[in-house]
Amino acid sequence: MSVSPATVTVMEVSPRDGLQNEDALLSTEQKLQLVQHALNAGCKRIEVTSFVHPKRVPQMADAEALCAALPARSDVRYTGLILNGRGYQRLRDTCLDEAGLVVPATDTFGQNNQGLSAVSYTHLRAHETRSY
């Protein structure tokens, strides 16, 4: 019995994860260029932004504008990261194909990233998710 998966899907995350901690704010156009480079390289799944409060992650303040400007591609799946129900509501109003949800594995990460322990965050998001 093989433990290897039949397929592996690679998701490009640089437009979101690669930019979220940068001090210099990139314009929406610069982010679109980064997405276009990923498309030109053959990426078929791209995490383009995060739907978080702009004060928490200023680099993602243009999430909706970025999504509205993405090139329509039937062969590509665009993803956005959410941390809570408000983020999901914002994502639903865009053209994105998927929502990614971070679930912290440790209390330290949970406190630093979401402001909750891993268990508290998981219970809260499970309850929220059932409502959708």
Give, region by region, the residue ranges found by the protein language model:
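N-terminal active-site wall of soluble small-molecule enzyme domains
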Residues: S50-A72, V76-T79, L83-R90
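Short, well-ordered coil/turn segments that N-cap beta-strands
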Residues: V8, C43-K44, S74-Y78, D97
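N-terminal glycine-rich anion-binding loops that anchor highly charged ligand groups
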Residues: A6-E12, K31-E47, K55
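Glycine-rich, proline-tolerant flexible connector loops at the mouths of alpha/beta enzymes
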Residues: R45-L66, P104-L116
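N-terminal small/glycine-rich loop or linker at the start of catalytic domains
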Residues: S2-D23, G100-N113
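Conserved, mostly hydrophobic/aromatic
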Residues: G18, A38, L91, A99
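Conserved small/polar residues in nucleotide/adenosyl-binding loops
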Residues: T122-T129
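Active-site mouth loops of central-metabolism enzymes
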Residues: P15-Q30, Y78-N84, N112-G115
